Every structure is written in C-alpha cells, then in structure tokens.
C-alpha cells in the first residue's frame, strides 16, 4: 500500500506533464489498482478513526489521475452506448453475483466503477459517482445523486431527488458524509464536505453547505459544516443586521436512536412546533 501511495503522490505532483501518451504502464496499473480497491470497498476515501473522519487525499488524487491517463472507451448496456474514461460498475456482473451481494438495482440506475455498494442496498433510478462509498442496508431513491467520494453510512435513506455533493468538480478538500441511520428528505442538497451525524432526520428541501447557518433552536447556537447526531432539521430563516431574513436550517429537536427506531419519520417532522 505504501508503494501505491508513493506512486500516486509522485505522479500527482507532476500532473501538468502527464497525459495518455507519455504515462508509463507502472503508473497506469497503480492508478487502476486503486480504483479497483475502491470499487470493492477495500479502500475508502474517508473513514472514521477514533471518532474523527479522516480523508485519504492520495485516493482522491488517484481518481483525478485516472481521468488523465485513461482513454475514453465505448461500452454498452444493451439499450444504448456510452463513451467515457470510467466504465460502469455492473457491466460484467452475473445474476449470481447480484444475489450474493443482495443488491437490487432498478433501471436506469447508474454506478461508476470505483464506487462501493454494500450488501442489502437498493438503488432506484439514481446516480452514484466514482469513489463513493455506500454502506449496507441503504436505499438511494429515484433521481438521487451521490457525488464523487461521498460517504454514505448503514441504513441510510436518501429520498427522491436528493443531492449529495462530490469532491472532484468543483474540487473540495473533504467529502460529504452521511453517517449511519440517517434520513435525508426529498430534494435536499448536502454538499461541500458537510457531515450529517448518525440518527439524524433532514426534512424535505433542506440545503446545507459549509456557509449555511445551522441554528440549534434549543441551545440558541449557530453551527457550521456539521449536523450533530440525532438532530431533526428543517428549512428556516434568521434575521440579518439589515432586518432581512436569510436562509438557514433549524435543528428543532434531538432524538436518540431508540426514539428514531420507534417513531415514524413523518411524526417527528409534524411535531416540530411542540
């Protein structure tokens, strides 16, 4: 692994001089090996270590380099053709392999090579970009998008039209992270490396980036970039210095995992005025 990391870092430092026609086979093999290991979940761009999310920047670099060194290739799903530098994850899957991994995929769901999909996952017609990691028991609903290198935990529900931001375009330092047992409401957007901690419920139409004010109603505090564990979050607004109300999101209550498991999502959101 140390050798792979050194090759990637050294090549990335020289990226302005690298292209398809001058890259050596050893470098190409190293880059493609990293993508394969991301694809099967042996590596992940970001992981929680001792309670903190750590981003492995060299893995992001490998993904970016793959666009420099790999050529566009023609591939087909029997309905139409594609022409891209990264193939689709399930191009060569057999029925047996799908059964073993207990994954259900509804057309035209699209997953690029380099993304990991855990067991017991359901993919409605959605899009999952390379480098993403989706853990077990998660559902990605219709027209939801999981951006490059985004990290999605166990038993997460991404509702219809949800957008989870990537890190490659525009380039971001850290991936967007949705921890275990979270519910993200329809048409919400979580981007720019924001972390939604475990057991949180995000209402429909919530937009959170690094500059979005996250107002904790009970504690009267403003947070940025992270929604604490067990939060129930809805759209809102706060008055500015010029008496103009500006968009924010509001943490209206905190719930623990036990309450979340026993209480319907709709009930939690309908009781926000209590």
UniProtKB/Swiss-Prot annotation:
Enzyme class: transferase
EC number(s) from the headed UniProt entry: 2.3.1.117
Positions contributing to substrate binding: 104, 141
Keyword Repeat (UniProt): yes
Biological process according to GO: diaminopimelate biosynthetic process; lysine biosynthetic process via diaminopimelate
InterPro entries named among the record's database cross-references: DapD_Trfase_Hexpep_rpt_fam, Hexapep, Hexapep_transf_CS, THP_succinylTrfase_dom1, THP_succinylTrfase_N_sf, Trans_hexapeptide_repeat, Trimer_LpxA-like_sf
Gene Ontology annotations for the cellular component aspect, listed alphabetically: cytoplasm
GO molecular function: 2,3,4,5-tetrahydropyridine-2,6-dicarboxylate N-succinyltransferase activity
Primary location recorded for the protein, binned into one broad class: cytoplasm
Pathway: Amino-acid biosynthesis; L-lysine biosynthesis via DAP pathway; LL-2,6-diaminopimelate from (S)-tetrahydrodipicolinate (succinylase route): step 1/3
Top-level lineage group: Bacteria
Localization per record: Cytoplasm
Parts of the chain that traverse the membrane: none
Catalytic reaction annotation: (S)-2,3,4,5-tetrahydrodipicolinate + succinyl-CoA + H2O = (S)-2-succinylamino-6-oxoheptanedioate + CoA
UniProt entry keywords in alphabetical sequence: Acyltransferase, Amino-acid biosynthesis, Cytoplasm, Diaminopimelate biosynthesis, Lysine biosynthesis, Repeat, Transferase
Family indicated by similarity: Belongs to the transferase hexapeptide repeat family.
Assembly and oligomerization: Homotrimer.
Protein name: 2,3,4,5-tetrahydropyridine-2,6-dicarboxylate N-succinyltransferase
Natural source organism: Buchnera aphidicola subsp. Baizongia pistaciae (strain Bp)
Gene that encodes it: dapD
């Amino acid at each position: 692994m140390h050798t792979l990391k050194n090759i990637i870092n050294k090549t990335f430092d020289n990226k302005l001089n690298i292209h398809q026609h001058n890259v050596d086979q050893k470098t190409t093999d190293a880059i493609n090996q990293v993508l394969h290991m991301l694809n099967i979940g042996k590596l992940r761009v970001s992981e929680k270590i001792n309670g903190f999310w750590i981003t492995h920047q060299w893995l992001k670099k490998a993904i970016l380099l793959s666009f420099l060194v790999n050529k566009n290739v023609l591939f087909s799903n029997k309905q139409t053709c594609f022409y891209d530098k990264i193939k689709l994850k399930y191009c060569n899957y057999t029925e047996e392999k799908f059964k073993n991994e207990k994954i259900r995929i509804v057309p035209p769901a699209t997953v690029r090579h380099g993304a990991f999909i855990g067991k017991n996952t359901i993919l409605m017609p959605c899009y999952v970009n390379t480098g993403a990691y989706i853990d077990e028991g998660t559902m990605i609903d219709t027209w939801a998008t999981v951006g490059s290198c985004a990290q999605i935990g166990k038993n997460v529900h991404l509702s219809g039209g949800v957008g989870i931001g990537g890190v490659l375009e525009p380039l971001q330092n850290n991936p967007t992270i949705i921890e275990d047992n979270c519910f993200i409401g329809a048409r919400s957007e979580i981007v720019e490396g924001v972390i939604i901690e475990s057991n949180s419920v995000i209402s429909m139409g919530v937009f959170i980036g690094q500059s979005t004010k996250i107002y904790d109603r009970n504690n009267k505090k403003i947070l940025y970039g992270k929604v604490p564990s067990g939060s129930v979050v809805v759209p809102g607004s706060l008055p500015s210095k010029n008496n103009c109300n500006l968009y924010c999101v509001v943490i209206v209550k905190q719930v623990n995992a036990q309450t979340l498991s026993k209480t319907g999502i709709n009930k939690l959101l309908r009781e926000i005025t209590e």
